[in-house]
From Swiss-Prot:
Its EC number is 2.7.7.7. It catalyses: DNA(n) + a 2'-deoxyribonucleoside 5'-triphosphate = DNA(n+1) + diphosphate. Monomer. This is DNA polymerase.
Length: 775
């Protein structure tokens, strides 16, 4: 199994290194015979001797073309003859390529920016992560006395925790009496002990959470300051910092450094990406957070170090568990695109598509188009086109809704209509598909480069799904599932890739044609559903819709929806297929991309309405949840309004317990850097004035008090709130917490802010006069 590939230089010559795991043993293979090359298209082939004379300089050494070869290739499907120019060293290419491109005899150069080791994997047909080797995984995490705003790695590392299949341990240099904690004499000894752990356990994969940006750079810096070498690599090398676009990534030679942070950011959508939030989202279990100021306080006073050590151990354990969850998926993506997992796990979906296309282009003898230069990139960024169709929703509370959507709408359109840069407006074809509205033509005489690859991916995914159904082996089933999910990620990224400004196979005409067909098909479905089957379509978003038959029973709605799916699929061309997604008992739509539904099991599904940030008080979150329940579970909007009025009444009468009023906000930088003083900053400044050490990362819980002046002056620390002495600002909580949380829902039913507040009734006019007369 190939883990990684790179090259080293000996006597001025490049040597490819392949890091492998074979029969449980780690090994390195070398290849001294692979030469770097680029392609050049000449105006006149007789000029090749002139081109061969081009030289440049690199580090005082003359760089030249060492060999040439004329080759037949294809460019966007059309035959082309180019020259393959060979060089002595990979670093010669960036030194000389501009001179070659600018030579009067040269039209253009190609494939001059593919890294040497990646070029080797492509040309030799080598696939990383292929095979059944059992890989050893180890996760680690550090706790430090670093505070944002100060010099990076100024404060010491106080704990290093690690976890693998044998469990989790913590190394520290202050006395902590716990069975999983090993105490050493100093920070220097702790780092040395960690190095020994890595040597003894010899993991193939080192898992971190944000290790690229924090743990590894911090460890490297501290080791430097303490004069310690950090040979974490299997070749005895230290971790190597690499620039990847606008981020820094850390490589450990011979081991895969798997930073989960990048993978999780790409894979799941969360309001915040702390380790605690991610763990809860994936495993449904909470994880305690110990803040930077608490860690510093425990270290300084010696009190509460057991809690910090437990937190550190859990960080490593949780990172290991998350690593085991996500690693197999990334391994499948690595196999699919044919590049090392270290790169794949740090790639955007656009880059994953590109690496896959580069490998397939080589296999098909296609010359890869060049990436855009700065000017072309800027031009592409300015281009725009119409996206998917989104219908303004029908407001109100609806019963008996069905959800219908297209299976892989955009990939299906690309394949069905052969949408590809090499088929676009191609002359001399017998048959074309013409995109609606935009009128771009796509040749149907031969399968386009990208549609043919996409079809193979979708066919493979269907085959895997069939195997999964037939398999009785749970492990085989899980591995097949990882593979089909990897294919799904790649397949669903092709449409976006066409419009990705940095793409080699960028094609704005392709992207806008795909969305134009998408709009046509969803509109066709809507028309047929309403006119032929009597449904009312309530909401459409790009590739799916919600609909109902007003007054019909649930069973009839479901039956007719299934009949419609069968009917429409017989009319749709090619791979296009509509699916019945599910039935919902009740639902309402506020605006585009904001709605809530309840299914037959009583599960509430919301989109765009959630209040999940911590700066919402418990009373706001609780009221919103009760409002949703009243509307969706009981079908009673009036009950929801009554709930809000009751809460505003209780707030007005000071009947809400203070713990439900606490608003939490985090201090994100040193206090002196804040220009706008929000309530949490004002509270933090008052704490600091009393001698409390306030550090970035600290979370302030505050309650807003009744009174005059700005809110920042009326906010106090939650723990200091005394109901006997203090009154909270009921108006603030009604206007800024509860009503905004429920208005986004109740506006859909025509309610305004004034309709939702409890009003203290006064007897006025005739009623008051009559009551007086009765007396």
């Amino acid at each position: 199994m190939i883990l990684d590939a790179d090259y080293i230089t000996e006597d001025g010559k490049p040597i490819i290194r392949i890091f492998k795991k074979e029969n449980g043993e780690f090994k390195v293979e070398y290849d001294r015979n692979f030469r770097p090359y680029i392609y050049a298209l000449l105006k006149d082939d007789s000029q090749i001797d002139e081109v061969k004379k081009i030289t440049a300089e690199r580090h005082g050494k003359i760089v030249r073309i060492v060999d040439v070869e004329k080759v037949k290739k294809k460019f966007l499907g059309r035959p082309i003859e180019v020259w393959k120019l060979y060089f002595e060293h990979p670093q010669d290419v960036p030194a000389i390529r501009d001179k070659i491109r600018e030579h009067p005899a040269v039209v253009d150069i190609f494939e001059y920016d593919i890294p040497f080791a990646k070029r080797y994997l492509i040309d030799k047909g080598l696939i990383p992560m292929e095979g059944d080797e059992e890989l050893k995984l180890l996760a680690f995490d550090i706790e430090t006395l670093y505070h944002e705003g100060e010099e990076f790695a100024k404060g010491p590392i106080i704990m290093i925790s690690y976890a693998d299949e044998e469990g989790a341990k913590v190394i520290t240099w202050k006395k902590v009496d716990l069975p999983y904690v090993e105490v050493v004499s100093s920070e220097r000894e702790m780092i040395k002990r960690f190095l020994k752990v890595i040597r003894e356990k010899d993991p193939d994969v080192i898992i971190t959470y944000n290790g690229d940006s924090f743990d590894l750079p911090y460890l490297v810096k501290r080791a430097e300051k303490l004069g310690i070498k950090l040979p974490l690599g299997r070749d005895g090398s230290e971790p190597k910092m690499q620039r990847l676009g606008d981020m820094t990534a850390v490589e450990i030679k011979g081991r895969i450094h798997f930073d989960l942070y990048h993978v999780i950011r790409r894979t799941i959508n969360l309001p915040t990406y702390t380790l605690e939030a991610v763990y809860e989202a994936i495993f449904g279990k909470p994880k305690e957070k110990v803040y930077a100021h608490e860690i510093a306080e425990a270290w300084e006073t010696g009190k509460g170090l057991e809690r910090v050590a437990k937190y550190s151990m859990e960080d490593a354990k949780v990172t290991y568990e998350l690593g085991r969850e996500f690693f197999p998926m990334e391994a499948q993506l690595s196999r699919l695109v044919g590049q090392p997992l270290w790169d794949v796990s740090r790639s955007s979906t656009g880059n994953l598509v590109e690496w896959y296309l580069l490998r397939k282009a080589y296999e098909r003898n296609e010359l890869a188009p060049n990436k855009p230069d700065e000017r072309e990139y800027e031009r592409r960024l300015r281009e725009s086109y119409a996206g998917g169709y989104v219908k303004e929703p029908e407001k109100g509370l609806w019963e008996g809704l069905v959800s219908l959507d297209f299976r892989s709408l955009y990939p299906s359109i690309i394949i069905t209509h052969n949408v590809s840069p090499d088929t676009l407006n191609r002359e001399g074809c017998r048959e074309y598909d013409v995109a609606p509205e935009v009128k771009h033509k796509f040749c149907k005489d031969f399968p386009g480069f990208i549609p043919s690859l996409l079809k193979r991916l979708l066919d493979e995914r269907q085959e895997i799904k069939r195997k999964m159904k037939a398999s009785k082996d749970p492990i085989e089933k899980k591995m097949l599932d990882y593979r089909q999910r990897a294919i799904k990620i790649l397949a669903n990224s092709y449409y976006g890739y066409y419009g990705y400004a940095k793409a080699r196979w960028y094609c704005k005409e392709c992207a806008e044609s795909v969305t134009a067909w998408g709009r046509e098909y969803i509109e066709f479905v809507r028309k047929e559903l309403e006119e032929k089957f009597g449904f009312k379509v309530l909401y459409i978003d790009t590739d799916g819709l919600y609909a109902t038959i007003p007054g019909a029973k649930p069973e009839e709605i479901k039956r007719k929806a299934l009949e419609f799916v069968e009917y429409i699929n017989a009319k749709l061309p090619g791979l296009l297929e509509l699916e019945y997604e599910g039935f919902y008992v009740r639902g309402f739509f506020v605006t585009k991309k904001k709605y809530a539904l309840i299914d037959e099991e009583g599960k509430i599904i919301t989109r765009g309405l959630e209040i999940v940030r911590r700066d919402w008080s418990e009373i706001a979150k609780e009221t919103q949840a009760k409002v949703l329940e009243a509307i969706l579970k009981h079908g009673n909007v009036e009950e929801a309004v009554k709930i809000v009025k009751e809460v505003t009444e209780k707030l007005s009468k000071y009947e809400i317990p203070p713990e439900k009023l606490v608003i939490y906000e985090q201090i994100t930088r040193p206090l002196h850097e804040y220009k706008a003083i929000g309530p949490h900053v004002a509270v933090a400044k008052r704490l600091a004035a009393r001698g409390v050490k306030v550090r970035p990362g600290m979370v302030i819980g505050y309650i807003v008090l009744r009174g005059d002046g700005p809110i920042s002056k009326r906010a106090i620390l939650a723990e200091e709130f005394d109901p006997r002495k203090h009154k909270y600002d009921a108006e603030y909580y009604i206007e800024n917490q509860v009503l905004p949380a429920v208005l986004r829902i109740l506006e859909a039913f025509g309610y305004r802010k004034g309709d939702l507040r409890w009003q203290k009734t006064k007897q006025t006019g005739l009623t008051a006069w009559l009551n007086v007369k009765k007396k």
